[in-house]
From Swiss-Prot:
NCBIfam families: secE_bact. Residues 22-32 have a biased composition (Basic residues). It comes from Streptomyces coelicolor (strain ATCC BAA-471 / A3(2) / M145). One of its GO terms (biological process) is protein transport by the Sec complex. It is found in: Cell membrane. GO terms for molecular function: protein transmembrane transporter activity. Essential subunit of the Sec protein translocation channel SecYEG. Clamps together the 2 halves of SecY. May contact the channel plug during translocation. This is Protein translocase subunit SecE. Residues 1-32 are annotated as: Disordered. Component of the Sec protein translocase complex. Heterotrimer consisting of SecY, SecE and SecG subunits. The heterotrimers can form oligomers, although 1 heterotrimer is thought to be able to translocate proteins. Interacts with the ribosome. Interacts with SecDF, and other proteins may be involved. Interacts with SecA. It is a single-pass membrane protein.
């Protein structure tokens, strides 16, 4: 097909995609009801939680102590920065 100035380009027959409807895969998943899918979901949750490596009591105590100490240090740091900014603002603005 030759394109002239001002002509309308029409798509060729081989350019068009075939009309294909997406078919749903029936299989086992498509036929389960909502309660069975919910039960499967909870079974999968339990199966995944069994794979988790839980910390021992000693490790848990250590991790908790480290987190609490870190939080206390961060609270102190933010308090000091806030105290410094408030005194600087009082000095500048009276």
């Amino acid at each position: 097909m030759t394109d002239a100035v001002g002509s309308i380009d029409m798509p060729d027959a081989q350019d068009e995609a075939p009309d294909s409807k997406k078919s749903r895969k029936g299989g086992k998943r498509g036929k389960k009801g909502p309660l069975k899918r919910l039960a499967l979901f909870y079974r999968q949750i339990v199966a995944e939680l069994r794979k988790v490596v839980w910390p021992s009591r000693n490790q848990l105590t250590t991790y908790t102590t480290v987190v609490i100490i870190f939080v206390v240090i961060m609270i102190g740091l933010v308090t000091l920065i806030d105290y410094g900014f408030s005194h600087a603002a009082k000095y500048v603005f009276g």
